[in-house]
Amino acid sequence: MQSVINTVKGKALEVAEYLTPVLKESKFKETGVITPEEFLAAGDHLVHHCPTWQWSAGEESKIKPYLPNDKQFLMTKNVPCYKRCKQMEYSDEQEAIIEEDDGDGGWVDTFHHSLTGVTEAVKEITLETQDCGKTTSNIAVDDDDDDDEGEAADMEDYEESGLLDNDDATVDTSKIKEACKPKADLGGEDAILQTRTYDLYITYDKYYQTPRLWLFGYDEQRRPLTVENMYEDISQDHVKKTVTIENHPHLPPPPMCSVHPCRHAEVMKKIIETVAEGGGELGVHMYLLIFLKFVQAVIPTIEYDYTRHFTM
């Protein structure tokens, strides 16, 4: 039943997107949405710091006129996925419902309680230009702890954990790393047999005026995964609600998994406000870097490329 509802909603949104005018004036600071030009700037910034991500044109017949022909969307391919979500060690105590009154039951932040420290005032947020090929991250007041690598925090944790509210505290990502630790040694034969790969894409959604993530998976022999197979690699709290199956706007079938963008602008707006309260300013060019941390809560076992360090 939920799949039927999602299909109907998807068709309605296709029409709505077609009728929605292209956003021309920046409203990033006020509402968290971005223009196509701002999407391009954020995409260029991502490609510069994380070169496994690249711009792509897609099918000529599906080119969007408000984006350059050779920069229709971003993609990264052959991203490893070593374990299924059910093999991760987490419990209900680690979850928190975000926005309970949204009519859909709220957004479940699976590792909400894994972060144990926050920072008070932010003068600026800058990206450390370090190796982005590794999928570990540190969010800290400085970069003295280069050897202390842990899993990245997701975007909701920035706002819900009271990011930037306490004195001289460092976000401890080591607990997230421990929470996501597979039950079996990744070096074992069983782990190798279970390794999958994913192609990830980031498009600009004209209706929601935000980025949107798409993913499609393959097994060990590079054979396409079924929808049910891909659902095994997605947090079960998000399957068929936050994550739906839809056609990629720039590529031919088959349909792909997509992380619905209806909450992205709202969450980004809260982060912008939090940073501003600390005396800092969040540049729109950082959008996709934060976005990739945000969606990690939805696909925690897919080890895509994101920045290692944010200096607060």
Curated annotation (Swiss-Prot):
An example of a Pfam family matching this protein is Autophagy_act_C
UniProt entry keywords in alphabetical sequence = Autophagy, Cytoplasm, Isopeptide bond, Protein transport, Transferase, Transport, Ubl conjugation, Ubl conjugation pathway
The superkingdom of the source organism is Eukaryota
Region of interest (Disordered), residue spans: 136-156
State where the record puts the cross-link Glycyl lysine isopeptide (Lys-Gly) (interchain with G-Cter in ATG12). K241
Q: Name one GO molecular function term.
A: Atg8-family conjugating enzyme activity
Name the source organism.
Xenopus tropicalis
Please name the catalytic residues of this protein: C262 (glycyl thioester intermediate)
Subcellular location(s) per record: Cytoplasm
InterPro entries linked to this entry: Atg3/Atg10
State its role.
E2 conjugating enzyme that catalyzes the covalent conjugation of the C-terminal Gly of ATG8-like proteins (GABARAP, GABARAPL1, GABARAPL2 or MAP1LC3A) to the amino group of phosphatidylethanolamine (PE)-containing lipids in the membrane resulting in membrane-bound ATG8-like proteins which is one of the key steps in the development of autophagic isolation membranes during autophagosome formation. Cycles back and forth between binding to ATG7 for loading with the ATG8-like proteins and binding to E3 enzyme, composed of ATG12, ATG5 and ATG16L1 to promote ATG8-like proteins lipidation.
Q: Motif (LIR motif) spans which residues?
A: 104-110
State its Enzyme Commission number(s): 2.3.2.-
Q: How does it assemble?
A: Homdimer. Interacts with ATG7; this interaction forms an E1-E2 complex that is essential for the transfer of GABARAP thioester from ATG7 to ATG3 and disrupts interaction with the E3 enzyme complex. Interacts with ATG12; this interaction is ATG7-dependent, essential for phosphatidylethanolamine (PE)-conjugated ATG8-like proteins formation and also mediates the autoconjugation of ATG12 on ATG3. Interacts with the E3 enzyme complex composed of 4 sets of ATG12-ATG5 and ATG16L1 (400 kDa); this interaction disrupts interaction with ATG7 and promotes ATG8-like proteins lipidation.
Where in the sequence is the signal peptide annotated?
none
Gene Ontology terms describing biological process:
autophagosome assembly; autophagy; mitochondrial fragmentation involved in apoptotic process; protein transport
Find motif (Membrane-curvature-sensing motif) and give its ranges: 4-19
Q: What about PTM?
A: Conjugated to ATG12 at Lys-241. ATG12-conjugation plays a role in regulation of mitochondrial homeostasis and cell death, while it is not involved in phosphatidylethanolamine-conjugation to ATG8-like proteins and autophagy.
The molecule here is called Ubiquitin-like-conjugating enzyme ATG3
Comment block on domains: The N-terminal region works in concert with its geometry-selective amphipathic helix (AH) to promote LC3-PE conjugation activity only on the target membrane. The LC3 interacting regions (LIR) motif mediates interaction with GABARAP and MAP1LC3A in a beta-sheet conformation-dependent manner. The LIR motif is required for LC3 lipidation and ATG3~LC3 thioester formation.
Query: Where does this protein have compositionally biased stretches of type Acidic residues?
Result: 141-156
Question: What family, per the record?
Answer: Belongs to the ATG3 family.
The answer to whether the entry has keyword Protein transport is yes
